[in-house]
Amino acid sequence: MPVVLGQKAPDFTVNTSKGPITLSNYRGKWVLLFSHPGDFTPVCTTEFIAFTERYEDFQKLGVELIGLSIDSVFSHIAWIRDIKEHFGIDIPFPIIADIDKEVAREYNLIDEKSGATVRGVFIIDPNQIVRWMIYYPAETGRNIEEIIRVIKALQFNWDRKLATPANWQPGQEGIEPAPTTVDSSFKRDNEQGVKTWYLKFVK
């Protein structure tokens, strides 16, 4: 069954550029799982450099990065070495070698036309629940800043049980859940931060 937003992330044990890993061993941590169409491709190379340049920021947020494509582990190794040689960048996170496409199919990542993995992103919370998923066109590189913003928004919700409004940035107000009864809606009328009975901002 394909991955579903808000449901448990399908578990897997796979070989990677850093050896075997099992997703369930990451329980208790935030995970960013992202797929790319192929090694030695221009857009993917810029993305892996960009992810690496922000790797410390992900680590400070307690987020583990895991890459994925259907290339072999030998292809991953050669690509990592090539990036090191030409850009001076050491890729610090594992890249799954999903040559049998098992994980890619579980996460609905296969482009049926090309047979390659699409440019997907999944944020998995410490309970192994898929909290965010998005697919980018093959021609469009990912915005790392936006991915980090979404992680911070999800962690804000995790910590404070507040939603985030449009264009939210860290440090800005969150939104309390709307009242679920008529009586509680009237009680809210004079509270600080209330714009209307169903919309209350909280710092």
Curated annotation (Swiss-Prot):
Substrate binds at residue 119. GO terms for biological process: cell redox homeostasis; cellular response to stress; hydrogen peroxide catabolic process; response to oxidative stress. NCBIfam families: PRK13189.1, PRK13190.1. This is Peroxiredoxin. GO terms for cellular component: cytosol. Residues 3-156 form the Thioredoxin domain. Its main location: cytoplasm. GO terms for molecular function: thioredoxin peroxidase activity. It is found in: Cytoplasm. It catalyses: a hydroperoxide + [thioredoxin]-dithiol = an alcohol + [thioredoxin]-disulfide + H2O. Its EC number is 1.11.1.24. The active site is at 44 (cysteine sulfenic acid (-soh) intermediate). InterPro entries: AhpC/TSA, Peroxiredoxin, Peroxiredoxin_AhpC-typ, Peroxiredoxin_C, Peroxiredoxin_TDXH, PRX_1cys, Thioredoxin-like_sf, Thioredoxin_domain. Belongs to the peroxiredoxin family. Prx6 subfamily. The active site is a conserved redox-active cysteine residue, the peroxidatic cysteine (C(P)), which makes the nucleophilic attack on the peroxide substrate. The peroxide oxidizes the C(P)-SH to cysteine sulfenic acid (C(P)-SOH), which then reacts with another cysteine residue, the resolving cysteine (C(R)), to form a disulfide bridge. The disulfide is subsequently reduced by an appropriate electron donor to complete the catalytic cycle. In this 1-Cys peroxiredoxin, no C(R) is present and C(P) instead forms a disulfide with a cysteine from another protein or with a small thiol molecule. CDD domains: PRX_1cys.
